[in-house]
Regions:
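Short secondary-structure boundary segments
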Residues: 1-4, 29, 95-98, 114
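Central regulatory/effector-binding core of bacterial HTH transcription factors
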Residues: 1-8, 74-75
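Flexible hinge/capping segments at coil-to-helix
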Residues: 10-50, 133
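Short beta-strand->loop
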Residues: 13-20, 105-118
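Secondary-structure junction motif
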Residues: 42-65, 131-133, 139, 148-151
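Hydrophobic hinge/microswitch elements
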Residues: 51, 56-109
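A late-sequence structural motif
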Residues: 109-152
Length: 152
């Protein structure tokens, strides 16, 4: 999940934060002319849905930066957002850890990173599963290498 479970509200459910990473903005070549983040006003944007924590964080970030962006669409799937972005010459957002996959596609370029807007990852499990070996392994694994910044 992209947010923790409040166990006082969701009885019997628990969550453990397993990592977080910043987000990057991507587009197909050629990149916008203005520097980041002003370039976000040059093309329409594809963002995570407002129901997601990341979608809400991004809307707040746009506002705090004084950016007047045009949102073309909201998506719950990063791969679909990337495909739609390529088809409509739009800028799209994805967690920076996706960079390894996106760099393989030479038609897609990273135009900027925001390290103070974080995508969070939480493992959610039922109380009855807390002693299950798989849940224990997920909760006790060090994921820091997975969430380290991608090299540009």
């Amino acid at each position: 999940s992209d947010c923790p479970i409040d166990s006082t509200q969701q009885e019997g459910l628990f969550s453990v934060r397993i990592g977080e990473c910043g987000v990057s903005f991507w587009c197909t070549n050629p990149p916008p002319e203005k520097p980041f983040p002003a370039c976000l006003e040059e093309r329409r944007l594809l963002i995570p849905g407002r129901r997601s924590m990341l979608g809400r964080k991004l809307l707040n970030w746009f506002n705090s930066q004084g950016l007047n962006v045009e949102i073309l669409g909201e998506f719950d799937d990063a791969a679909l957002m990337k495909a739609f972005g390529a088809m409509h010459n739009a800028i799209f957002v994805a967690p920076t850890l996706y960079a390894y996959d996106f760099y393989a596609d030479k038609t897609v370029v990273e135009i900027g990173r925001v390290e103070n807007v974080m995508e969070e990852y939480h493992a959610i499990f039922a109380e009855r599963m807390i002693q299950h070996p798989a849940v224990q392994r997920i909760c006790n694994t060090d994921y820091s290498a997975l969430f380290s910044p991608a090299v540009r």
